[in-house]
């Protein structure tokens, strides 16, 4: 049972070396080197050691007392029960004894064993333990050795000896050394005191002590409630179960109730808490890097209607002027304090009415009716050139997708409000309700230059019209130094391009006077606006009087932001505006000298990666998003040679953009969307405007077809307009377009469904708007017209005014128009485009609009953009 190997420190008596021989002396606890050497020698063989050395004190002198006898007696009167478990359970009450009469110099070992009292099995019934049968087979006896053993008699006598560490188990296969007992049997603990040297000796006596009050019955659960109460009250470790303890029944129930309540509250909190959505609008004055803007545009989830799910739509948009304060994230790194969003009245119709319900793919459908505060002199709204040319396209994800009806497309009743509004309050991107990606493709590469006005513009649209206000308009360019030599044109302040939905009239200059009734706009100042990928013919045919000043917006959206475009009548000379595109990475502040004297206002359009510094004094730069056409660029009646340098799509020009001046025949006229209202009065003195576009277009004069733009009412239909454009661009930069298709009319026969402005039924049919526009040679792929035009939601139910011809046949089905103008080879794979459109914008965003989010810095040609699933996209 006890071996020396278990306790190497035990000083044993004479050890038996063989049957009859013992070592003559005890083995020292720590033998010395000499002893070890002597031990190597053969030991002296002696007869068995005679047991003559009896203990110094008589055997009966050793006494043991049960220290906690009172507690044991208290339990024994009721009937002590001890819990046994598979894992082992300590005893309570504990065995606490006190020894006396030991030899202080001798070492002793204390052992505990538990033996059955009888051979019966018990059951607790009728509040007493009764014998119910014979005992189970006796288990091998196990002994618990006190941890202090071996210890001298002095050690044991000077302290209370407790066997509290002994554990009882009913696991017959226990390997932990616990005492194995049967449940429902009666047992008696015993304590043995043995001299350490006598452990292995025969015939030596040991002292065993038993206490009748320590008998107990083993149970797996307390049977007698009195025992339970005694144990709870007596056991310091069970005080939690007492009446005033933490584990009492009352406390347990209370804790359980609190736990259930807290869990329910947590569930409610989880349900009620607002979701952490990255789509939430960024606070104003947030400096968005171009990459962040791109990510935001691409990653934001789009709801079915293409709006932020988080965005709360203004519930009651009524005729009454409602102040709409948009907390739109500004794309500007620096926002002057004056750029706080101003209240602006919105037209009665809701954005939801104008916007397509399920066309979430039309990223830039919505314009904001946000009033733009007057730009400060040194207001530098540095519009980061988002690396993704289409970061602006996801404008619909902006919080309140309100078509900027107030200024750009102001319903007749709303016009008066704007008549008095300073030019700075022109919502940019007003009419760009649903810009095809093609129109908005440039917006990202050429961040629309928005002064403070950009605050309310859709981020993705980034259509920031530079609308000078009554304030000194010297620095209109977001990046221009605080004191650039810009002369403000005060007279233009009241004027703003407004599409009177009621009248369906857009002032020819695209600029309606504050009353929008100005019969004749004298010399419209050539306003510079970033040119969208589609470059329409620069000059309207001088012969077309009514259309002479039609805004050269092939864009379906009339830019309202064109305030100050009409120089005061006193300005006999229209200021020619040259739009040089600065090389990428260069932000060139453009000092636009707009004065009575014609000043060429150079609008450098930086390639992608550049911050556009459009400083338009009077004229407000039009968001590039309206790339499909030069929006509201008053095309002087006089022929103007405009050199269009188209940026090569494949490469971003790090150096200055090579602009191969393409001389435009003076006769070239910009086709205006049929929906555009005819200009009330001809502009007497159009100023020649040169539009240098980055050149992917091969050098060489491109004879822009001298298109005589009839008044909007006279514009019969897009087919007519397209036919009128004989312009053939040599070697179009589009890889997917065969050279024979370079003819502009062929390529741009795309019919875009008219986007109905939220305020009025006026529809700007993009098909008429864009057909004349040459396919953008810029590296900004336009959204395939097929993806836009085929949305039935885009077709507004509002009828065209009599002066505008609606072509229902073109709107519902693009094939006939496409086949007539464009080679069928382009569209053969997809006879029905509407079928390919997914109603769920999320699922369809990846492929159809993938090109919108592509980075413009790609080194490869445009082919990758346009070859989307076998579908050619312009």
Curated annotation (Swiss-Prot):
Disruption phenotype: Morpholino knockdown of the protein results in a complete inhibition of the segmentation of the presomitic mesoderm. Residues 364-396, 428-453, 466-551, 563-626, 664-695, 720-776 are annotated as: Disordered. It is found in: Nucleus. Residues 381-396, 443-453, 615-626 have a biased composition (Low complexity). It holds the Pfam family T-box. Keywords: Developmental protein, DNA-binding, Nucleus, Transcription, Transcription regulation. One of its GO terms (molecular function) is DNA-binding transcription factor activity, RNA polymerase II-specific. Residues 71-243 bind DNA. Residues 367-380, 429-442, 468-480, 495-528, 536-551, 584-614, 664-674, 720-734, 742-771 have a biased composition (Polar residues). One of its GO terms (cellular component) is nucleus. It comes from the Eukaryota. InterPro entries: p53-like_TF_DNA-bd_sf, T-box_DNA-bd, T-box_sf, TF_T-box, TF_T-box_CS. Residues 683-695 have a biased composition (Pro residues). GO terms for biological process: anterior/posterior pattern specification; blood vessel morphogenesis; cell fate specification; morphogenesis of embryonic epithelium; positive regulation of DNA-templated transcription; regulation of skeletal muscle tissue development; regulation of transcription by RNA polymerase II; somatic motor neuron differentiation. Its main location: nucleus. T-box transcription factor involved in the development of paraxial mesoderm. This is T-box transcription factor TBX6. It comes from Danio rerio. The gene is tbx6.
């Amino acid at each position: 049972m006890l071996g020396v190997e278990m306790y190497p420190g035990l000083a044993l008596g004479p050890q038996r070396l063989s049957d009859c021989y013992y070592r003559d002396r005890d083995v020292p606890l720590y033998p010395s080197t000499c002893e070890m050497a002597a031990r190597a020698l053969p030991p002296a063989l002696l007869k068995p050691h005679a047991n003559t050395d009896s203990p110094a004190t008589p055997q009966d002198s050793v006494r043991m007392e049960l220290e906690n006898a009172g507690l044991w007696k208290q339990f024994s009167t009721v009937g002590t029960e001890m819990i046994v478990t598979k894992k082992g359970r300590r005893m309570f009450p504990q065995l606490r004894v006190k020894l006396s009469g030991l030899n202080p110099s001798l070492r002793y070992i204390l052992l505990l064993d538990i033996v059955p009292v009888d051979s019966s099995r018990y059951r607790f019934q009728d509040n007493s333990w009764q014998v119910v049968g014979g005992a189970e087979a006796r288990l091998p006896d196990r002994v618990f050795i006190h941890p202090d053993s071996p210890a001298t008699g002095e050690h044991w006598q000077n302290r209370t000896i407790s066997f509290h560490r002994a554990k009882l188990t009913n696991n017959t296969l226990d390997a932990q050394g616990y005492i194995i007992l049967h449940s429902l049997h009666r047992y008696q603990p015993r304590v043995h005191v043995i001299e350490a040297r006598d452990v292995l000796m025969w015939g030596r006596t040991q002292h065993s002590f038993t206490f009748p009050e320590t008998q107990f019955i083993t149970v797996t659960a307390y049977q007698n409630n009195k025992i339970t109460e005694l144990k709870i009250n007596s056991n310091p470790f069970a005080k939690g179960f007492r009446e005033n303890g933490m584990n009492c029944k009352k406390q347990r129930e209370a804790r359980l109730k609190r736990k259930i309540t807290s869990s329910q509250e947590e569930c409610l909190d989880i349900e009620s808490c607002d979701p952490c959505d990255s789509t939430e609008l960024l606070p104003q004055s947030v400096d968005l890097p171009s990459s962040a803007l791109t990510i935001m545009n691409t990653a934001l989830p789009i709801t079915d209607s293409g709006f932020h799910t988080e965005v709360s739509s203004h519930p009651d948009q009524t005729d009454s002027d409602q102040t709409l304060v948009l907390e739109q994230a500004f794309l500007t790194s620096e926002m002057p304090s004056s750029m706080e969003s101003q209240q602006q009245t919105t037209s009665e119709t809701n954005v939801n009415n104008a916007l397509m319900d399920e066309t979430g793919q039309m990223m830039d459908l919505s314009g904001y009716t946000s009033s733009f505060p007057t730009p400060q002199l040194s207001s530098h709204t540095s519009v980061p050139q988002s690396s993704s040319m289409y970061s602006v396209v996801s404008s619909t994800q902006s919080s309140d997708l309100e078509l900027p009806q107030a200024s750009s497309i102001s319903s007749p009743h709303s016009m008066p409000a704007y008549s008095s509004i300073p030019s700075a309050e022109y919502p940019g991107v007003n009419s760009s309700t649903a810009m095809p990606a093609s129109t908005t493709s440039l917006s990202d590469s050429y961040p629309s230059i928005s002064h403070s006005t950009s605050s309310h513009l859709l981020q993705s649209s980034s259509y920031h019209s530079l609308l000078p206000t009554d304030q000194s308009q010297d620095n209109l360019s977001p990046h221009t130094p605080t004191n650039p030599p810009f002369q403000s044109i005060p007279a233009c302040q009241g004027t703003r391009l407004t599409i009177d939905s009621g009248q369906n009239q857009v002032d020819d200059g695209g600029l309606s006077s504050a009353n929008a009734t100005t019969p004749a706009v004298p010399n419209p100042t050539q306003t510079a606006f970033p040119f969208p990928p589609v470059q329409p013919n620069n000059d309207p045919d001088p012969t077309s009087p009514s259309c002479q000043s039609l805004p050269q917006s092939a864009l379906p959206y009339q830019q309202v932001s064109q305030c100050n475009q009409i120089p005061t009548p006193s300005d006999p000379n229209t200021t020619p505006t040259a739009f040089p595109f600065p090389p990428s990475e260069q932000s060139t502040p453009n000092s636009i000298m707009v004065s009575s004297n014609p000043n060429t206002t150079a609008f450098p359009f930086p390639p992608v990666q550049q911050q556009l510094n459009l400083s338009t004094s009077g004229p407000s730069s039009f968001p590039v998003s309206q790339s499909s056409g030069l929006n509201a660029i008053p095309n002087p009646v006089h022929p103007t040679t405009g050199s269009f340098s188209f940026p090569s799509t494949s490469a971003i020009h790090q150096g200055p953009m090579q602009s191969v001046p393409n001389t435009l025949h003076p006769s070239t006229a910009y086709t205006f969307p049929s929906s555009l209202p005819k200009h009330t009065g001809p502009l007497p003195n159009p100023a020649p405007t040169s539009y240098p576009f980055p050149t992917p277009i091969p050098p060489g004069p491109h004879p822009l077809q001298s298109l005589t733009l009839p008044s909007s009412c006279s514009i019969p239909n897009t087919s007519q307009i397209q036919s009128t454009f004989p312009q053939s661009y040599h070697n179009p930069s589009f890889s997917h377009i065969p050279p024979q298709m370079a003819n502009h009319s062929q390529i741009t026969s795309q019919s875009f469904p008219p986007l109905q402005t939220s305020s009025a039924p006026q529809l700007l049919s993009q098909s008429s708007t864009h057909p004349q526009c040459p396919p953008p040679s810029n590296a900004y792929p336009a959204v395939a017209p097929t993806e836009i035009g085929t949305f039935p939601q885009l077709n507004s139910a509002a009828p065209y005014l009599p002066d505008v011809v609606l072509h229902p046949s073109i709107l519902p089905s693009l094939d006939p128009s496409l086949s007539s103008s464009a080679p069928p080879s382009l569209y053969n794979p997809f006879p029905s485009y509407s079928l390919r459109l997914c109603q769920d914008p999320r699922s369809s965003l990846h492929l159809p609009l993938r090109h919108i989010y592509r980075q413009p810095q790609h080194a490869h040609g445009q082919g990758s953009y346009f070859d989307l699933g076998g579908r050619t996209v312009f």
